[in-house]
Amino acid sequence: MNILKIELANVEQTNLGFEHWVDVTYTVPILKNEYTVKLLLFMECKIEDQEVIEYLVSTWKYRDLVLHSLQMYEMEKNNNFTILD
């Protein structure tokens, strides 16, 4: 998996903590397209350091990205799904 971009999109404070919405763009060899997904990092404190966010995504959320890529592979394979430029 090649993660192309990790960008903090939004931070919202709730009664339980801080919701960090992160846009992650990635490619994998089995997919025809690159995809951007929105991931949720739920933390006790507000995190704005880009390196920390990149670390959390690449460690905590890596499995979610792999699952998404497998789902997209199935869609591309079964439905001949492609993104038009």
Question: Can you describe what each PLM-predicted range is?
Answer:
Residues 2-35:
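Amphipathic, interaction-prone secondary-structure segments
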Residues 5, 34-85:
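Acidic, low-complexity intrinsically disordered segments
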